[in-house]
Amino acid sequence: MAIRNFRPYTPGTRTRVVTDFSEITSRKPERTLVVAKHRRKGRNNRGVITCRHRGGGHKRLYRVVDFRRNKHGVPAKVAAIHYDPHRNARLALLFYADGEKRYILAPAGVQVGQTVVSGPDAPIENGNAMPLSSVPLGSAVHCVELYAGRGGQMVRTAGASAQVMAKEGDYVALKLPSTEVRLVRRECYATLGEVGNSEMRNTSLGKAGRRRWLGRRPQVRGSVMNPCDHPHGGGEGRAPIGRSGPVTPWGKPALGLKTRKRNKPSNQYVLRKRRKTSKRSRGGRDS
């Protein structure tokens, strides 16, 4: 897998950088694993906007992904690597020995024809799923469960992986991609290796239209709005926001304020907090 750069034939291709899709082996998805999904466009059940700047975009069909890997001891053959419009990672189509077909997140390095298996006695190979108690120290894992049997909830984006740091008692210490070190129950399942398509972080959309194709609408800065639309709005010309710090459209502190509760019960499982990120690195902008 590699990335593809374009010559400046048009303004949209001047800065466009995409993955070359060379790892995709089949264009059509498995029909038995595809369902229609209503797009919420950032609205809740009452039609109220709960997530701004969402809407439009290309039509999609949802691929049903197996995050549980609960067919223990049944070997599966990787039949194809598919594209998924709902995520940055690729999907691996598995044909199990009993005839069942399932999608999983395609781990890095997994090839068509390779055999993967899940279970406590699975071999230590890339793509196999097993309890964290069976994973060797220092190994990279992804699609990690927070609660046993609920399915992988952490470390699922393209190129992501967590590292097994230590084992003590009923818990395993994991170093997450955010550098946070967290305790997870040893019976929780995880998949060996990192998620594929790691070059996704080096891509660039190149133009605003490609962002619209993904269902992302334009973001307007609060400082150019009217005061009735945003606390930063109003004034003559490029006026300052007139506050001690930036706020959201609803007047809540923004850009740097910690929103995690101090007495959150799961704080006892966080051994080391994630590193502090600067405004530039996290892509902060005027709300």
Curated annotation (Swiss-Prot):
Residues 271-287 have a biased composition (Basic residues). One of its GO terms (biological process) is translation. One of its GO terms (cellular component) is large ribosomal subunit. It holds the Pfam family Ribosomal_L2. Keywords: Ribonucleoprotein, Ribosomal protein, RNA-binding, rRNA-binding. The keyword Manganese does not apply. Residues 221-287 are annotated as: Disordered. It comes from the Bacteria. GO terms for molecular function: rRNA binding; structural constituent of ribosome; transferase activity. Coiled coil: none annotated. Part of the 50S ribosomal subunit. Forms a bridge to the 30S subunit in the 70S ribosome. One of the primary rRNA binding proteins. Required for association of the 30S and 50S subunits to form the 70S ribosome, for tRNA binding and peptide bond formation. It has been suggested to have peptidyltransferase activity; this is somewhat controversial. Makes several contacts with the 16S rRNA in the 70S ribosome. Belongs to the universal ribosomal protein uL2 family. This is Large ribosomal subunit protein uL2. It comes from Synechococcus sp. (strain CC9605). The gene is rplB.
